[in-house]
Amino acid sequence: MNIPDNLRYTKDHEWLQLLDDGVTAVVGITDFAQSELGDIVFVETKPVGTKVAAHGAFGTVEAVKTVADLFAPVAGEIVEVNGALDDAAIVNSDPYNEGWIVKMKLDNAAEVESLLSPADYSALIGE
């Protein structure tokens, strides 16, 4: 299972990458999540400008066999939705790069420290 060292993770299998500006983060689902979901056919998110609470739902991922909610790792505002998600299969093929889901402006960047480290996430999924 691919668990990049430069990201933080949630128990709900989302990942977050804090960008160099220190207030913007990229969010997506993990390789483990996409493999458990199976073939992803549709991703829907709340619109740009939506404020989301930490652990609040910001969208859904629809796969052939199920629909799963997406939860914000930390509180913030959605500032961009990945336009490449029109082809939702990109989340299966490249969940950490081209398959990112939203960019958020964080309310409190210090919240990132409360997320799981790569080692902790690896232990969570039994890797």
From Swiss-Prot:
UniProt cross-references to InterPro entries, sorted A to Z: 2-oxoA_DH_lipoyl-BS (IPR003016), Biotin_lipoyl (IPR000089), GCV_H (IPR002930), GCV_H/Fam206 (IPR033753), GCV_H_sub (IPR017453), Single_hybrid_motif (IPR011053)
Residues that bear N6-lipoyllysine: 65
GO cellular component, one term: cytoplasm
GO biological process terms, semicolon-separated: glycine decarboxylation via glycine cleavage system
Pfam families membership: GCV_H
Needed cofactors: (R)-lipoate
Signal sequence extent: none
Keywords of this entry: Lipoyl
Cofactor: record remark: Binds 1 lipoyl cofactor covalently.
Residue span, Lipoyl-binding domain: 24-105
Family the UniProt entry places it in: Belongs to the GcvH family.
PANTHER family in the cross-refs: GLYCINE CLEAVAGE SYSTEM H PROTEIN, GLYCINE CLEAVAGE SYSTEM H PROTEIN-RELATED
Subunit structure, interactors included: The glycine cleavage system is composed of four proteins: P, T, L and H.
UniProt function note: The glycine cleavage system catalyzes the degradation of glycine. The H protein shuttles the methylamine group of glycine from the P protein to the T protein.
Protein's recorded name: Glycine cleavage system H protein
Species for this entry: Chlorobaculum parvum (strain DSM 263 / NCIMB 8327) (Chlorobium vibrioforme subsp. thiosulfatophilum)
